Amino acid sequence: MDSISLENFRELQSAGVQVIDSRPTVLFSERHIRGTIGISINGSFEYMANAIFKKAEKLILISLNERLSESFLRLEAEGFTDVVYFDISLWFEAGLDSSLVSRVSASSASKYLEKIVDVSNSEDWEVLHVKGVSNVPLVDIVKNPNKIRQDSVLYCGNGHKSMAAVSYLLTKNIITTDITGGLSAMLVDSPDLEI
């Protein structure tokens, strides 16, 4: 599939067309285009797409080449049919500004306990979560971003929904931090946390 041009991408983004970046969370966190939303193909891709984006609206997709067809097909299966592809290397090669996501390691999570919010589905939260931490699922964040305070530290099971939440909140000027690897990593690297 051919990429739209850099000029076309900038025009569409300026016009309010939302951008899905389906690259792995580590790549998105280290370097992405401001205003794009990271929903990794490696996570609950369909759930996150449906939670954040409207099927009737045009979308721009950023993806690794080897996962491009899969990303398109999975979006199409969910009813997202007006999707165009943008090759992010065009942005980077042009030397344009890129953004990063603030992250903290799972081993340091206990330092942020008063700021931590679990953005997992409520069903997953009921099964397993950090003791004393509140739950605001991704779908609820999209409905009302102000449920999350500035400087909150977000996590989910494996770090995919929390990256989606952090990047979505950035588009609403709410700055938060992601815990790398989510609860799975905290169970291993932060044994002092009560689960």
Give residue ranges: language-model regions.
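A general structural motif
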Residues: 2, 17, 40-42
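C-terminal accessory/connector segments of nucleic-acid motor ATPases
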Residues: 1-14
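Rhodanese-like catalytic fold shared by cysteine-dependent sulfurtransferases
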Residues: 25-153, 157-195
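Short secondary-structure boundary micro-motifs
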Residues: 2, 20-23, 118
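Short, compositionally biased "basic patch" segments
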Residues: 13-28
